[in-house]
Amino acid sequence: MFQGILLVIDGKIKKITENENPLYENGIDLKGKYVVPGFIDAHIHGAYGADAMDGTVEALKTISSFVVKHGTTNFLATTLTSTKEILKNVLEKIAEVQNKELEGANIFGAHMEGPYFDIQYKGAQNEKYMKPAGIEEIKEYLNIKPGLVKLFSLSPKDDAALEAIKFLKENGVIVSVGHSAVYFDDVQKAIKAGLSHSTHTYNGMRGFTHREPGVVGAVLSSDAVMAEVIFDKIHVHPEAVRLMLKAKGVDKVECITDAMSATGLPDGNYKLGELDVYVKDNQARLVSNDALAGSVLTLDKAFKNVIELGYSIFDAVKMTSTNAAKEFGLNTGEIAEGKDADLVVLNNDYSVDMTFVRGKLKYQA
């Protein structure tokens, strides 16, 4: 951490000067504030009344405009388990706006959450669309636009799933374990096949016991796996987050929101895909069985929660930005010369004051 000047030209960090030189012409004086890399959310379904599964460009733009107010500069629009036809339509809409300048955060691709899951750990996914993995179907998703699908969550429950993992990895897609009833040894086989990510770790997966470490044990013990966590203090107890960080280190944990359409809106009744959800006391739950149904979290809150747990601002930056940037090969996530100028200006209480995407001011409090 230092005081100095950031020179941004054509959307990139051109020069960093570590001193108190006078401001450049058209400069912004941020004295007394923090400047950190923009947050990256690899798992978000919706916000402010919009859901990626709405299948419209307008919905995606609404999510983009909302999350930028909370410091997110890049995100993966995330799908839900559904029919092949609906999923292809949603992916086509995401493809239209992928890496195109929007009023808010950049959408750098799609995260397909499903449909190859286990009903036992369905969470808020619709079980009627769950099915075994199939490479021919996956090809249809990937053929919509090369490089669109960046992350694919599935359960590595059989040989078909293992073949799908190999195929996805060969095609540049990161594969994640999620909504899965498999055992420790099954995840180990999946890691050997190319799996390297864990979807909202602890949630929607076989838990840890001393006789069967489960999916959780496999994720915590593997250096090859990047672990997502919904750090809203609701989905995961703070001490379980600390345990994860002790097991994996701050370089292998990513804060995600798993936010749904009610994020940013008052308590009330909403939809998550086709399922009815109610929101109360910062919790989104299914009307049918009271199960947690995504979150109403924003990454600025997750950033604060990391610091409140006793970790440094540097660790919080890694978990909300740098780790995801490295995992997905993005030219951002660090304040360094040559990097994209995706930046968040924070006040002393870590609230968002300004957000810059590719050097352009997209939000100011």
Model-derived features: positions:
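Charged helix-capping and loop-helix junction motifs
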Residues: 56-59, 90-93, 134-136, 210-216
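Divalent metal-dependent hydrolysis catalytic cores, especially in the metallo-beta-lactamase
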Residues: 45, 61-90, 105-118, 145-157, ...
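Active-site core of metal-dependent hydrolases
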Residues: 139, 143-265
